């Protein structure tokens, strides 16, 4: 949620920054016009309530003076004022709901360092990384070797990814991990969680269903309600689209102790997504599923520390890819490509040799106080004694299924086997996946 005082006091600047976020010109004008109506109604209601108090005093005085005529007139005036207050309250309730709904649909404002542009073509690469020794690895080839297979093809050949039965049981974009596939997925997320614990994150096991209030606090609702899986009576609960929702809401409606900041937390969870806008995209494989595992990182920080913590969180995500020795690059997203609640986002994209391009595997964002305002998450500043909103940061560390897919593509061998990355071998128990040990 944006600070309405900032929007009022910096109208032109705020309007341009919203246009940069692909908000239509005029949306802010409508919001501020309704906000002024709301404030005007509040002033009128306060004046009438003050008048009601005066009339109440007049009634008391007239009764004490046994002036029945004056008392009856004052009572009549009271009834008139009460009716006016009731009418104003009804108008105020309607305009407040309108203002709140409009404000809830406005995205966060981008940090000035974010590249301005309407789409992903304006994203800017920050850095690129690949292992120093790529001997025998597909990524070392200037051209994709003819034997190289897409991750879903080699997964099916080895019998470790079963898409056909996933579709039979649950429909499109579902699968079964089988044998070594399930063990590889488990090895990957256990490795990720252990790395983040070493980096200072406290591990949580969160609920997988949350209330609509929780979805509102992190910015998924009301704008993206069609992308969610709503369940329960009257659709009062939602399957989490990311552990970010459960992690941020862990401290919703709380005043944190300043000594807790920065607070690092992490969790593994399934993510449930409708993928409403993904028709025809990535219809095969692990890239775009309705249910997938993801390790999430979240931070609560002081405002002055949040961008330094954003850089650290990005490095924490990069650390996973570097230890897995998977080629990747980091891009800073443009104003038109960032997520709804983000003020700045870095995407990590891992190399997929069969696609001859990088694919997103992590998105790391600073939401500044956008979520904290919606979720009322504050701390008391020890210097001023005043309450301040924390800044919240979130990042994938990483999307587990996409990591498995990247391993299958980058670590496959000409004989159809998969070499297990060295850091995963203590978790997986073997150094290769072949047809002989796939189950």
Swiss-Prot record:
Disulfide bonds listed in the record: none
Binding site for L-serine: 242-244, 296, 396
Compartment annotation: Cytoplasm
GO cellular component terms, A-Z: cytoplasm
Keyword flag Ribonucleoprotein: no
Keywords tagged on the record: Aminoacyl-tRNA synthetase, ATP-binding, Cytoplasm, Ligase, Nucleotide-binding, Protein biosynthesis
Recorded catalytic activity of this chain's protein: tRNA(Ser) + L-serine + ATP = L-seryl-tRNA(Ser) + AMP + diphosphate + H(+); tRNA(Sec) + L-serine + ATP = L-seryl-tRNA(Sec) + AMP + diphosphate + H(+)
A Gene Ontology BP annotation from the UniProt entry: seryl-tRNA aminoacylation
Binding site for ATP: 273-275, 360-363
Recorded family membership: Belongs to the class-II aminoacyl-tRNA synthetase family. Type-1 seryl-tRNA synthetase subfamily.
Quaternary structure (record): Homodimer. The tRNA molecule binds across the dimer.
Record comment regarding domains: Consists of two distinct domains, a catalytic core and a N-terminal extension that is involved in tRNA binding.
Name of this chain's protein: Serine--tRNA ligase
Organism of derivation: Oenococcus oeni (strain ATCC BAA-331 / PSU-1)
């Amino acid at each position: 949620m944006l600070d309405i005082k900032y929007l009022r006091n910096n109208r032109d600047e705020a309007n341009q920054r919203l246009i940069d976020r692909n908000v239509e010109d005029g949306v802010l004008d409508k919001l501020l016009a309704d906000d002024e109506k709301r404030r005007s109604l509040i002033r009128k209601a306060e004046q009438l309530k003050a008048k009601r108090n005066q009339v109440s005093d007049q009634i008391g005085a007239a009764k004490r003076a046994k002036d029945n005529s004056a008392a009856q007139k004052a009572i009549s005036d009271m009834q008139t004022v009460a009716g006016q207050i009731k009418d104003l309250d009804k108008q105020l309730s309607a305009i407040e709901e309108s203002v709140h709904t409009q404000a809830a649909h406005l995205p966060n404002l981008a940090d000035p360092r974010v590249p301005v542009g309407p789409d992903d073509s304006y994203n800017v690469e920050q850095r690129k990384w690949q292992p120093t020794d790529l001997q025998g690895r597909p990524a070392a080839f200037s051209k994709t070797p003819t034997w190289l297979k897409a991750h879903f093809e080699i997964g099916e050949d080895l019998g470790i990814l079963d898409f056909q039965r996933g579709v039979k049981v649950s429909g499109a974009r579902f699968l079964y991990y089988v044998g070594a596939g399930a063990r590889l997925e488990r090895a990957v997320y256990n490795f990720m969680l252990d790395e983040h614990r070493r980096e200072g994150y406290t591990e949580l096991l969160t609920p997988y269903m949350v209330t609509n209030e929780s979805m509102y606090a992190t910015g998924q609702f009301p704008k993206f309600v069609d992308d969610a899986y709503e369940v329960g009576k009257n659709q009062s609960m939602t399957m989490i689209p990311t552990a970010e929702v459960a992690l941020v809401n862990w401290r919703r409606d709380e005043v944190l102790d300043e000594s807790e900041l920065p607070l690092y937390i992490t969790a593994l969870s399934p993510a449930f997504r409708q993928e409403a806008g993904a028709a025809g995209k990535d219809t095969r494989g692990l890239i775009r599923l309705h249910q997938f595992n993801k390790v999430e990182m979240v931070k609560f920080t002081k405002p002055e520390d949040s961008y330094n913590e954003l850089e650290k969180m990005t490095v924490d995500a990069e650390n996973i890819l570097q230890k897995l020795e998977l080629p990747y690059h980091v891009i800073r997203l443009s104003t038109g490509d960032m997520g709804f609640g983000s003020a700045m986002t870095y995407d990590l994209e891992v190399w997929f040799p069969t696609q001859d391009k990088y694919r997103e595997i992590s998105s790391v964002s600073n939401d500044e106080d956008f979520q904290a305002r919606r979720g009322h998450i504050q701390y008391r500043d020890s210097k001023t004694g005043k309450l301040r909103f924390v800044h919240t940061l979130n990042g994938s560390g990483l999307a587990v299924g996409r990591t498995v897919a990247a391993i299958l593509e980058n670590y496959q061998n000409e004989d159809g086997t998969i070499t297990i990355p060295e850091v995963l071998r203590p978790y997986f128990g073997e150094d290769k996946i072949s047809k002989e040990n796939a189950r």
